[in-house]
């Protein structure tokens, strides 16, 4: 019991130190006076998540440059250097509830009725092309959406270790390859 309490205090102390990187004295005071459970949850967040929480997912302009730079520094690329992998594997990842589950938030899947939390991705590759810039942008948003959209609810698939760089490249291929069923078949529910 005593050892567990000491461990919890040590973790809270380290988290508090990390949070101080972003938070001012007033914010830290509010966290510490919000109650034990609140402080434990809040202080156990990663510093970037804590920053989003403090600012209710709307970062002030003066924090954006550093935040975006830090988020972009987290992006890792496939060992092959190729940002488009196998679209068939990408389709299996995109449409799998236990993998990326992209269709739950985005409309455009030819396999499942899509959600509307995120933007429609219907015929994504046909509308945007497959240029290197489009491949890079698509890969980076999937890897770490916060590098472009700070504090968005979209999973940060690579940054959070949910998908490997190679799996993300497969999803990019699924979205962009003109031969992919994502671009050749109608989306479920399309008119």
Show where each model-derived region lies:
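Post-cleavage N-terminal segment of exported redox proteins
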Residues: 11-87, 141, 175-191
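Mobile, glycine-rich extracellular loop/lid and propeptide segments
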Residues: 160
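Sec-exported extracytoplasmic/periplasmic mature domains
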Residues: 95-98, 143, 147, 173-180
